[in-house]
Structures are given as C-alpha cells and as structure tokens.
Amino acid sequence: MRILISNDDGVTAPGIAALHAALADHAECVVIAPDQDKSGAGSSLTLDRPLHPQTLANGFISLNGTPTDCVHLGLNGLLEHTPDMVVSGINLGANLGDDVLYSGTVAAALEGRFLGGTSLAFSLLSRLPDNLPTAAYIARRLVEAQSRLELPPRTVLNINIPNLPLEHIRGIQLTRLGHRARAAAPTKVVNPRGKEGYWIAVAGDAEDGGPGTDFHAVMQGYVSITPLQLDRTFNDAFERFDGWLEGVL
C-alpha cells in the first residue's frame, strides 16, 4: 500500500513526523506538506504563483502552498506512483464540529477523495506534543483497520484524539459533528506606523456538544470518529421551495 501523508501544521511539525514513523513500516509512505504552518487554510488552492516542491534531508517533500495543494500535486503527477490513500495529521489542536470547514488537516484528507477510497484526518486535542505517541499509535491501528471497513466512495474519517496517555483512553466512539458558538470579536492592533489590523479570535466554545457529538466523546476520554462527505446539499430544505420559485423568472 502507498500512503500520501500531509498536514497543515507544516512539514517540520512534530505531528507529521510521528505519523510517518508510525506508518512507515506498515506501508510505503511519502510526505508532502506545506513549508510553513497553514492552519485554517481550508480547501484553498494556490493559483497566483507557481508551486515549488523541495525534498528535504529526511525525504519529506516541502511545498510552498496549502495542504490541498500538497495532496493535489501528489495525486496529479508529482509522484512516480499514485498513492492508494491519503492520511493527514497529526494536527496539534482539535478539529471538532465547525472546525472542519476551516481545517487544512481535514481539507488535505478531503482532497484525497479523488482516489475513490477512504481518507483519514487525525487531530490531537493539544497544542503540545506530549501525547503524540498515543495519537500515533491510534492512527496506526485505525489505518491498519480501515481496509476491513466498507464505506461509500470518497468518505473521509475525521478522527480526534483526547490529550491523554494511551492507558487513559476509554475507547472509540462513532460521532456526529457538534457545533460551536460564534467566535469572539477579532482583536484590534495598531502597528508602530499607526496602521490598524486585526487578529482573528479563537473558535467559539461548543454550543451543541451533547452526547453523540465529537465534542462530548473526546471530553469523556474517547477517540471520536466522524464520517464526512463532500456533498453539503441541504436536502431537507427542498420542500420549503415548493411554489416559491413560481413567477421569479
């Protein structure tokens, strides 16, 4: 099996090194990741300049682009052999609920949908790497197990891992996405020349984080697995349009 590994924390981040080390003796792994932190890049592509891959001393490929750029190039000619699956992470920080809309970690896995199989995105609920060994072990076990799982084509598994030692992980739960409350207001700053700017505030707290959600699972010490799909069509809203379009044109 050939696995393409990417992330949004950057090619030198400890999470991607831990993920590669965990999977390298299970599959043929290649790493293509951004040359700098691209957290919050979502599914953006770089269209205003060329992308320049650079192979580092450890064999990882660094790219001056987004996580989606990395996987896009990896699936479309940069590599000699097309990967069989995409695995993203290990992100230092949660990707729960609405986070999946902005997450470069999840976006990298979503770009892997063109392979037709299942892609996986891993996140650890900590900005510190202390429990990366836990996350790496769980990532390996789930990558090994996913071949036995029959899912619809182009499914992405969004996996969040509590910031705990392995012996304190209570198990794994299948969850739905929760929802966050609105974020706080941006922080206004003024540079020495008097020019105003803003720092985006941190994500809001869980507004819908009850039992069954990804928020609830990880807070209870469980690994959360949420199956995602690209189709965001709001099918239940269709009936509300009955008669509304008549006479619009």
Swiss-Prot record:
Its EC number(s): 3.1.3.5
Pfam families given in the database record: SurE
Gene: surE
Enzyme class: hydrolase
Gene3D superfamilies on file: Survival protein SurE-like phosphatase/nucleotidase
GO cellular component: cytoplasm
Keywords tagged on the record: Cytoplasm, Hydrolase, Metal-binding, Nucleotide-binding
Cofactor dependency: a divalent metal cation
GO molecular function: 3'-nucleotidase activity; 5'-nucleotidase activity; exopolyphosphatase activity; metal ion binding; nucleotide binding
General function of this protein: Nucleotidase that shows phosphatase activity on nucleoside 5'-monophosphates.
InterPro entries tied to this protein: SurE, SurE-like_Pase/nucleotidase, SurE-like_sf
Keyword hit for RNA-binding: no
Descriptive protein name: 5'-nucleotidase SurE
Cofactor note: Binds 1 divalent metal cation per subunit.
Signal peptide: none
Binding site for a divalent metal cation: D8, D9, S39, N91
The UniProt record lists the keyword Repressor: no
Recorded catalytic activity of this chain's protein: a ribonucleoside 5'-phosphate + H2O = a ribonucleoside + phosphate
Similarity comment: Belongs to the SurE nucleotidase family.
Compartments reported by the entry: Cytoplasm
